[in-house]
Design a protein with these regions (language model features):
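ATP-dependent carboxylate/acyl-activation modules
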Residues: 107, 316-318, 441-449, 457
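Residue-level signal for inorganic ion chemistry
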Residues: 38, 57, 92, 107, ...
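N-terminal leader/targeting and accessory segments in enzymes
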Residues: 1-91, 351-353, 379-380, 384-394
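Phosphate-binding loop of NTP-binding sites
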Residues: 8, 88-221, 225-233, 426, ...
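Short acidic-hydrophobic, aromatic-tinged amphipathic segments that line or gate anion-handling sites
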Residues: 80-84, 411-420
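Acidic, Mg2+-coordinating active-site environments of NTP-dependent enzymes
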Residues: 8, 67, 71-75, 182-328, ...
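Active-site beta-alpha connecting loops in nucleotide-dependent enzymes
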Residues: 45-48, 315, 333-407, 457
Length: 457
């Protein structure tokens, strides 16, 4: 974080007429990070209440503390009262963002946000100093933290925007003020909170609230909800598609090559290019198209963007291929929903190996759609060319039953991680491949921790 005047950073939070030019070089929510000249933001929590550390933060040199309410022992002149700590972070993040002028790409969507963010970063990073959202810092606390990482030498920023309720993307977009927006697709994640995919689409389109007049909005032309959505008139839609040559950017001759994909990219503005990406599945080709469209609409050269995409690296447990002895394991257990499950099974069906096995767990936060979604997953698994399916989790029991009913002969529903690992170890042989996918809360890496040591023997 670059140092900026307190009066600039606290504008909209401090009382009218507040004036203090002292430089602030850190905004923190962690009392252990407090240093002279910082601002400490107190968050109430289940285990700790940041308000309990406010007085100590001032003793250690904090210039100001942001509090939800007055705290005994904290001088009023050093306390900034904001009933909502998240709102305070967003206001300061927006104020800080306004002092600098990098080109910003904002990424949202139901599926593929993080991968598209990573691809966009890879596409842009070769053109100048670029930052991106780290980890899962895509909410009203994490996004301001990303803003605070912008410096005077930052030329580009790629910012992921997540949500679970309506209104959240609008607030994030107004903080980040992207120059280009991306909506990857409209799925069913958080449908329990929003009620319908139409409402999810409206929530994702809130990214337009942060886009200036004439800004490009990169949209999935293969998504029926985005296609029929009423787009704000102030944005300029840029459509990408797998196969539709009428789109602004499309992919033709899509094929899997080893652990990646190859395709012909057609750009109405720039012609045709042969592209390879080190990620499997047609859904990742769509993510690459979105990243390409955003980067080139910033004015970056297509050749350099494509070269960057070829160096893309997956993060975490997102379709990470692990060679376990003489078997391949595709770790895709960072998150899951019906759309990403379907895409993963389609990718895995084309994966070159002797036999295919899958360990699938619950998809969380589906509300009333959970039962039919898990049953449909079972039917999809039965058609995915699997030798055997192992499931784990209460909802995944529906998947196991549906797969059996659809004709998959070898199906095991495991009651714990050890049973899941044992079922796979008893069946798999050299040359086989395993797909592992579930929502993050199912922690399927614990089953893999029991599986891998035996494979290595």
């Amino acid at each position: 974080m670059e140092k900026i005047a307190a009066e600039l950073l606290l504008k909209g939070l401090a009382p009218e007429g507040f004036a203090d030019s002292q430089p602030i070089g850190l905004v923190t929510t962690d009392s252990r990070e407090v240093c002279p000249g910082c601002i400490f933001v107190a968050f109430p929590g289940e285990r700790f209440d940041g308000h309990d550390f406010a007085a100590k933060a001032l003793e250690e040199g904090a210039a100001y503390v942001v509090l939800n309410h007055p705290v005994e022992g904290v001088p009023a002149e050093q306390a900034v009262i904001s009933p909502d700590s998240y709102h305070a972070m967003m206001v300061m993040g927006a104020n800080y963002r306004g002092q600098f002028h990098p080109k910003v790409v904002g990424v949202t969507g139901s599926v593929g946000k993080t991968t598209t963010k990573q691809m966009t970063y890879a596409a842009i990073a070769g053109f100048g100093n670029t930052i991106k959202t780290e980890g899962n810092q895509n909410n009203e606390l994490g996004l301001p933290r990303t803003m605070f990482r912008i410096g005077r030498d930052t030329e580009y920023a790629v910012v992921e925007m997540g949500m679970s309720h309506a209104g959240e993307i609008e607030r994030l977009a107004k903080c980040a003020r992207p120059d280009v927006g991306i909506i990857t697709c409209i799925g069913v994640s958080h449908i329990g909170n929003l009620g319908s995919q139409e409402n999810i689409c409206k929530a994702k389109l809130e990214i337009c609230a942060g886009l200036a007049e004439g800004s490009p909005l990169v949209l999935n032309g293969d998504d029926p909800f985005l296609r029929k959505a009423a787009l704000p008139t102030h944005v300029r839609p840029v459509w990408f598609s797998l196969g539709d040559e009428n789109a602004d950017v499309c992919a033709l001759d899509v094929r899997q090559e080893g652990d990646g994909m190859a395709f012909t990219l057609c750009d109405k503005n720039a012609g045709r290019y042969e592209v390879t990406i080190p990620a499997m599945g047609r859904h990742n080709v769509a993510n690459a198209l979105a990243a390409y469209a955003a980067a080139t609409r910033l004015g970056l050269a297509p050749e350099g963007v494509i070269a960057g995409l070829a160096d893309f690296e997956q993060t975490g447990m997102r379709q990470k291929v692990v060679h376990a002895g003489s078997m391949d394991v595709i770790e895709d257990c960072y998150n899951a929903n019906p759309d990403s499950m379907k895409a993963a099974l389609a990718m895995f069906k084309e994966y070159p190996c002797k036999r295919r096995f899958a360990l699938l767990g619950d998809m969380l936060e589906l509300g009333g759609m959970s039962a039919p979604a898990h049953e449909e997953l079972g039917r999809q698994a039965a058609e995915a060319g699997l030798t055997a399916l192992v499931t784990y989790g209460p909802e995944a029991a529906r998947t196991a039953k549906a797969a059996k009913d659809a004709g998959l002969a070898d199906v095991v529903h495991a009651e714990d991680y050890q049973q899941a690992a044992d079922a796979l170890l008893a069946r798999m042989e050299p040359g086989d491949a395993l797909l592992v996918k579930a929502s993050r809360g199912m922690a399927l890496e614990k089953a893999l921790a029991l599986f891998y040591p035996v494979c290595a023997k």
